[in-house]
């Protein structure tokens, strides 16, 4: 679940032999290709780009030749190129598109705006048509690194749709006359928002391999909007169950606040700044903060009836929140792919190295001979951090549904246990 990126990757794969280590880091030196011709070192290339940046910022741009041979303009450091009044495209977009017609790309063949997780090296799509993107759901053009992300939430959407259409209407909570209509509506809306969230995630992971940057950006906004709906619905169900019998005005106040904050987050989702890699902590904080609003209802339950009813919120913790918490750890730390040892990774820093991170590289990263299971060569295609995040999200959503059912039984069906 992520996007037009403007971050400076600090760790990257090197496609040539490594120079002697300096302060525990590796640097790239001059390479030779298979025919013996010398390649420019990454450091030299980075310095050239740094000079381009300096001239571009000082002089407002630099004349370049486009892929078609026509003059164009290189804009600033990000390197977008406009040719003969055509739509502005990121630097190296044409090369990536040409290669993407025939095969999947490695990380360094992608234009900079398409680079997300620097530890996922192989299997990147760069498709020119919507049809190819849609068919990639079925791996029509080979297994890619979004296959399991797509199918994990396709399965999740199917599970939640089953619960919405079959499991929930046949539950004892749904059929019980004691359970207020508002609580039933909130639980049903939660399941519907869960289906919407999973479908939005599937749409994003299906089309994040398109070569059309504007379309790609729209689909990531769709994904974030689905997440916002799910989190907001989770808070509303918690508030409806915990506060309905204690303070109706307080319940409505928290529901309005939750929906208002969710709406604000939904609007923010469509900001291009929200999608940038450096905004990852902000994204996590927004969703965690929105979810935490639901825990405030527990505080009011405790203030009203003290610890006698503290067990009311327990199912929410051990059936749902624990799964979300584990998933956030994988999402934020990029584990396990950051531990892969099947390719040579750099850990250097500094302006020259940061400039080198933007380069388009013809050669793939150096593959080591270590292809054992523990080298984690398989993380490009299976069991990477984002897939694990997807799995724990599905567990968290299903767990939340089971938790609010149990909480509803405590409040309305098991007379005298809650209050």
Swiss-Prot record:
Pfam families associated with the record: HlyIII
Listed InterPro entries: AdipoR/HlyIII-related (IPR004254)
Transmembrane domains' residue ranges: 148-168, 185-205, 226-246, 250-270, 284-304, 312-332, 378-398
An individual GO BP term: intracellular zinc ion homeostasis
GO cellular component: endoplasmic reticulum membrane
Topology of this chain in the membrane: Multi-pass membrane protein
Compartments, record wording: Endoplasmic reticulum membrane
Molecular function GO labels: signaling receptor activity
Glycosylation sites: 145, 208
Region (Disordered): 1-65
Keyword Disulfide bond listed: no
Alphabetic keyword roster: Endoplasmic reticulum, Glycoprotein, Membrane, Transmembrane, Transmembrane helix
Stretches of the chain found on the membrane's Lumenal side: 1-147, 206-225, 271-283, 333-377
Presence of keyword Iron: no
Segments on the Cytoplasmic side according to the record's topology features: 169-184, 247-249, 305-311, 399-419
Major localization class: endoplasmic reticulum
Top-level taxon of origin: Eukaryota
Known role: ADIPOR-like receptor involved in zinc metabolism either by altering membrane sterol content or by directly altering cellular zinc levels.
Similarity comment text for this entry: Belongs to the ADIPOR family.
Protein name per the record: ADIPOR-like receptor IZH3
Organism in which the protein naturally occurs: Eremothecium gossypii (strain ATCC 10895 / CBS 109.51 / FGSC 9923 / NRRL Y-1056) (Yeast)
Gene: IZH3
